Structure formats: structure tokens, C-alpha cells
């Protein structure tokens, strides 16, 4: 009886989390991923995005696992996370002054990949928007966990740095293996790596968050990464300060799909 009660409580928690992820997903980010610049999307395109978010929400099975580790910079300049060592000048700057770090893995689950594959086979225009929406949704999920951690550490008088993922700046993608091994991500979160270091499920993230005793002045402190903090100026997805507030623009309108069509049953 107690087991059944706990099962129902978990189902309710998951439904609440899924609603939080959908509700906090940054719609501007979705249009930015789709190549929009400078102009507001049309109503039918906004409706298509909302439709994709709603449908994706029904396939979410979010999982998150992370651990805190002591952190130091060794004499040779390498970063010692206790469970592994790494080299990255941009990450070293991000973690300056930190003596602990929080490493984590997060995923939207295998159901999202299944939905994306299905639409790739039957309706590519919608699949493209689905991909962008799912990418924004995993960021939204990480932001939710980021805020939860910030509150927890804040009660101890500690502050978080912007999260930093392998492949970001000069932090090599090779360190995905170190994250996966140290955190036992296959067991703890259902995340595996391919030989080419891609994560499965595809809408998954690994990252390190610095923990310090002083507030961080870097952009993105409140909830994750910021384009302003990244040195990759030529990134096609880089957020630009252009146009008026609340506007996004487009350079590839057709890629978002056309029309407010009836959703296929799949």
C-alpha cells in the first residue's frame, strides 16, 4: 500500500516537473535556433512552436543526477575535480576562487528521441521545429535544476558560477567520458555515449558548476550559460543584442514549417 502511494506521488511530481519544463522553455531561444533574426515570427509559426512544445511534453521523462566534489588548480595549471583532471583555460577562469564544484548529467529521456525520429520520417518541417524546441527544453530543465541548487547553496552562504559543458570554449568534448564514468550516468540517469561522444538520449547535457563564497559577476550566473560569456564570436546560434525587447527575427523563415496544420497521430 505504501509502495503504491509513493508511486502515485512520483507520477504527480513528474507531471509537475514536465509542466515546469514546458512553461519555462524560452520561446525566443527556439526561434534563434531556427535562424530567426530581427523580426517577430508570424502567428502561425508561434502556434507551431507551441504545438511542438505541447506534444513533446507528453514524451518527457526527465532525469537528473549530480554530485559535489572538492576542486583545485594544480601547479601545472590542470583542473583537479577529484574524480578526474582536465585542462581548459576558459573553464579555469570560470572557476576562479572556487573550492568545490558540482558535476551533473541531465536528460529529457528516450521518449523525446523516439518522437523526433518519427517526425523525421513523416513530416520533416515539423521535425526541424521539434528539434529546436527540444534543445530549448533541455536548457530549461537545466535552468530549473540550476535555480534549485542556487537556493540550496545560497542557504549555506555560497554562490554558483555559470554552468560549463564539455565542448564549450576550450573545454574538450573528450571530457564527456570523464563525466559519464565519474557520475555513472548510464546507471543514474540512463545516459550513454557513442564512440563519437554524442549522448544518448540526444537531448542530454553534462556540465560543471563552480561553487564559491563570493557572488559571480559573470553573465549567466542566475541560470546557466550566456552567449556574452562565450569567446566563440562566429557561432551561428550566438544571441545578438538587436531589435527591440521581446522580438526575435528570422533568416530562414521556411525552416520553421508553414501553416497551422492538424497534428498527425503517430
Name these PLM-found stretches:
Residues 2-130, 251-254, 263-266:
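Active-site helix-to-loop segments that bind/position phosphate- or nucleotide-bearing substrates
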Residues 44-47, 51, 136, 140, ...:
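Conserved active-site and cofactor/substrate-binding residues in soluble primary-metabolism enzymes
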Residues 108, 156-243, 247-266:
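Short terminal or interdomain "cap/linker" segment that borders an active site or interface and mediates
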Residues 112-114, 137, 168-172:
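Short, well-ordered, mixed-charge alpha-helical segments that flank or form enzyme active sites
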Residues 125-147:
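Compact, glycine/acidic-enriched structural inserts
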Amino acid at each position: 500500500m505504501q509502495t503504491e502511494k509513493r508511486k502515485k506521488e512520483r507520477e504527480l511530481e513528474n507531471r509537475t516537473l514536465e509542466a515546469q519544463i514546458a512553461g519555462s522553455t524560452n520561446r525566443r531561444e527556439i526561434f534563434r535556433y531556427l535562424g530567426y533574426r530581427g523580426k517577430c515570427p508570424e502567428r502561425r509559426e508561434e502556434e507551431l512552436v507551441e504545438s511542438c512544445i505541447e506534444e513533446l511534453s507528453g514524451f518527457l521523462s526527465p532525469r537528473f543526477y549530480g554530485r559535489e566534489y572538492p576542486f583545485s588548480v594544480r601547479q601545472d595549471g590542470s583542473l583537479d575535480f577529484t574524480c578526474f583532471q582536465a585542462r581548459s583555460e576558459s573553464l579555469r577562469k570560470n572557476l576562479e576562487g572556487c573550492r568545490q564544484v558540482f558535476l551533473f548529467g541531465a536528460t529529457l529521456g528516450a521518449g523525446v528521441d523516439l518522437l523526433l525520429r518519427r517526425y523525421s520520417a513523416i513530416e520533416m518541417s515539423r521535425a526541424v521545429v521539434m528539434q529546436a524546441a527540444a534543445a530549448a527544453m533541455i536548457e530549461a530543465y537545466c535552468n530549473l535544476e540550476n535555480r534549485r541548487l542556487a537556493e540550496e547553496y545560497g542557504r549555506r552562504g555560497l554562490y554558483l558560477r555559470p554552468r560549463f559543458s564539455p565542448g564549450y570554449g576550450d573545454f574538450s568534448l573528450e571530457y564527456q567520458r570523464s563525466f559519464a564514468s565519474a557520475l555513472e550516468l548510464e546507471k543514474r540517469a540512463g545516459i550513454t555515449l557513442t564512440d563519437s561522444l554524442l549522448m544518448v538520449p540526444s537531448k542530454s547535457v553534462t556540465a560543471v558548476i563552480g561553487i564559491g563564497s563570493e557572488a559571480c559577476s559573470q553573465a549567466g550566473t542566475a541560470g546557466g550559460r550566456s552567449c556574452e560569456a562565450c569567446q566563440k564570436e562566429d557561432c551561428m546560434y550566438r544571441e545578438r543584442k538587436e531589435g527591440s525587447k521581446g522580438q526575435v527575427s528570422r533568416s530562414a523563415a521556411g525552416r520553421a514549417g508553414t501553416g497551422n496544420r492538424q497534428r498527425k497521430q503517430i
